[in-house]
């Protein structure tokens, strides 16, 4: 009997957390009371065991000015679903279909709060993350903190009537190691506020000794220990950036050193009439796979200072690339994979490469060739 009793506790903190985010929706005001719908979306590994699926959790509420604990609210699980990619990408090698995440939502239909000047923090903490995350040290021992701030009247009179930005839940983009990729991390705002995006730190929360704290602590929170070469601002290294206006992450994906999982946290700031109203954050493990996309990739510029002849090749070769078409920008062309071309005169030429020309998996790119012998 005692062994059966202990099993759920031991499995409850097994590695499974893969990110998540809070959102809230303003419902109205009655007297001095503000009402909100608050929802937490949690990403976890597929096929979680029963100890990892908590039927109820606690949202902890704090005064944002004093950090005083206001109350804990028990919230029921409202939805569970798998985020599945049903088919492989036609123009990428390898298998990409299958389950990427199990999504669990906790929806608090109505939270009533006293109007105040500083606003409120709402937090939840849970341990632990999956093992062997490439950009974290000892990831399986690290928990997670999810938090969002509801603004108070000290931001503006209208700020407490704000509804947060909300992120899309469509995170099955295929990212291939050492290849260029884009990943849409954009959000939408029901109030029409202007949104800006930046990478930010992932937070620690919970522990192996206390995997499910009954009360989340108040901020500030400890930052996770990133592996060498990575940080909250550079979660996938120096070659990956986020567009501050669109929220699209792009760049050349790093190598796979362990599982290929990289923790990414994006903070979104809402501005109204030029003034910051609120912010929210989403954390997610992006999976980097050992696949090869069909891409035409060249260096931005090819300088030649020792003659008129240059050899070219695609920077992202693949067995799935069947044909090459080169336009050297001077009226000459080639269909070789690695052509050598001699220019007749000095100048700057626009070279174009098309791979699998006329095929469903065609791609093209351009670069400048500067001939100054």
Name each model feature, range by range.
Residues 1-8:
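Bacterial N-terminal signal peptides
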Residues 10-14:
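Sec/Tat signal peptide C-region and signal peptidase I cleavage site
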Residues 15-373:
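Extracellular/lumenal mature domains of secreted and surface-exposed proteins
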